[in-house]
């Protein structure tokens, strides 16, 4: 079962990403110490789409690499 949007947002926030706004069901997250950006779309209780899961994983990896 895919993770919920709420879980992806929690992962981003625990990794140092901050919500920089958005419109409607779209939320933009920027890492506080790097230039990594990711947009999360969907309602909090929705299942995350495969492409969104991949985008979040890439953003988390990029933020780790830029901080090292």
Regions found by a protein language model. Give the residues of each.
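Basic nucleic-acid-binding interfaces
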Residues: 1-21, 30-68
């Amino acid at each position: 079962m895919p993770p919920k949007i709420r879980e992806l947002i929690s992962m981003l926030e625990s990794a140092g990403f901050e919500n920089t706004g958005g419109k409607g069901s779209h939320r933009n997250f920027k890492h506080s110490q790097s230039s990594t950006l990711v947009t999360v779309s969907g309602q909090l209780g929705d299942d995350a789409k495969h492409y969104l899961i991949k985008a979040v994983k890439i953003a988390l990896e990029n933020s780790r690499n830029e901080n090292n």
